């Protein structure tokens, strides 16, 4: 099979049967789908683990088992570790849950790292990286070489086209009469009527294919628009491929394929849905709609992405490069999640075992210390319910502001490399808790 060498950028990374689909933007401007064989893994550690039980579990879960070692996160010592390599990316989560049930969460390491991030750490191909790849005509990557660093300032990248999909009017569409759908690309607005049914869906697909945007921005796309479109398409049995159809190097050049591709899903261009969730943060119950992502094309719900609203596409590109999280997922996460991903990547490169669950207890604090210092002294949690005459103190970006103005971070408090500096306010033991500002 003829080999091909290409230069370009890693547009997106997603799991496929037996490996990862790498959507690649060539220097010529083509977006093609490549395939990289890859099997993610997780580790089990602990003196109580029995080899016979581990091998039996690996056989049941169809995982490859190997003995190795790693650096313990807490002690810094090198300890034995057992590596479970799963058959494919989709089986990582189920296998980890089985291992947690069988051996306990304290035995698991490197188990909460997404396949995409594991792939980036193993190969160096991170989202939006510039790379040279050597692949077969069917898209199977044989070798790859990264040509830049995620830390490069103002790293060059291709221009990205954007289209907007929304309903007419303002406000949440679920709270008013259903209005026509608007598709805006290249400054031109097209209106589509829901009552046209199957023709409405086919026209939407035609508009998306003709504009071929790299980024499809929606308003309320995750919690209302895309679920409604998918439900309508399912009821009318009309395909709704809003993502890109996988095209291999052979497809682009016009050459015949020599064998079936392993790229993508059984339904090319399909919309991939996730899980919705609710959580409590500082006394507020927050709902996060299920993410709806596209293959080979980015989908960002402007109403479900704090980062997109604050930084736009350039900010998402930068954070995706730095964190190793694919852009569609980083758009729906917090800056803290991206920072954690950067820390995990650093640990993996250093051979440090990342605990599955946090198990390092905090230093003891008395009741008085907790009142003064815990959560900055803010210990009041509002009673759930409807209230009137409510006042709110909004500390926008409080923690980043403290880090920026006063250089406060885990690396600068009680560090061993500097003399004690300014005492941290309100901490009782001021001799031992200091901020070192010389970093």
Where do the protein language model's features map onto the residues?
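Positively charged, low-complexity/disordered segments
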Residues: 434-439
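The two-metal-ion catalytic cores of nucleic-acid processing enzymes
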Residues: 1-391, 395-396, 400-432
């Amino acid at each position: 099979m003829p080999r091909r060498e290409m230069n370009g950028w890693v547009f997106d990374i997603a799991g496929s049967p037996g490996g990862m689909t790498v959507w690649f933007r060539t220097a010529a401007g083509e977006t093609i789908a490549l395939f990289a064989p890859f099997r993610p893994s997780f580790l089990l550690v602990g003196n109580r683990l029995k080899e016979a039980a581990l091998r039996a579990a690996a056989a049941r879960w169809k995982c490859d088992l190997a003995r190795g070692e790693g650096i313990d996160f807490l002690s810094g010592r090198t300890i034995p570790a057992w590596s479970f390599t799963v058959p494919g990316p989709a089986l990582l989560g189920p296998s980890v849950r089985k291992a947690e049930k069988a051996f306990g969460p304290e035995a698991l390491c490197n188990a909460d790292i997404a396949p995409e991030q594991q792939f980036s750490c193993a190969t160096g191909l991170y989202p939006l990286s510039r790379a040279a790849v050597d692949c077969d005509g069917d898209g199977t990557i044989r070798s790859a070489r990264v040509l830049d660093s995620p830390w490069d300032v103002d790293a060059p990248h291709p221009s990205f086209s954007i289209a907007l999909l929304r309903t007419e009017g303002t406000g949440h569409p679920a709270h008013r009469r259903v209005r026509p759908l608007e598709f805006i690309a290249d400054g031109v607005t097209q209106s589509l009527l829901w009552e046209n049914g199957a023709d409405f869906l086919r026209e939407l697909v035609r508009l998306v294919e003709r504009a071929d945007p790299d980024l499809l921005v929606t308003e309320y796309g995750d919690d209302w628009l895309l679920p409604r479109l998918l439900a309508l398409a399912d009821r009318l049995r009309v395909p709704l491929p809003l993502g890109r159809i996988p095209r291999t190097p052979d497809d682009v050049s016009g050459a015949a394929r020599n064998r079936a591709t392993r790229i993508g899903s059984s339904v090319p261009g399909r919309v991939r849905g996730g899980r919705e969730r609710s959580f409590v943060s500082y006394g507020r119950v927050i709902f996060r709609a299920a993410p709806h992502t596209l293959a080979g094309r980015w989908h960002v719900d402007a109403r479900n992405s704090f980062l997109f609203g604050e930084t736009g596409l350039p900010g998402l590109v930068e954070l995706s490069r730095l964190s190793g999280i694919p852009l569609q997922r980083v758009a729906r996460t917090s800056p803290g999640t991206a920072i954690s991903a950067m820390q995990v990547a650093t640990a993996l490169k250093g051979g440090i075992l990342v605990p599955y669950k946090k198990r390092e207890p905090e230093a003891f604090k008395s009741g008085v210390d907790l009142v003064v210092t815990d959560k900055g002294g803010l210990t009041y949690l509002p009673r759930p319910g409807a209230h009137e005459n409510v006042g709110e103190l909004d500390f926008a970006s409080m923690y980043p502001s403290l880090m920026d103005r006063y250089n406060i971070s885990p690396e600068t408090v009680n560090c061993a490399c500097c003399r004690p500096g300014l005492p941290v306010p309100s901490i009782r033991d001021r001799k031992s808790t200091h901020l070192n500002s010389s970093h």
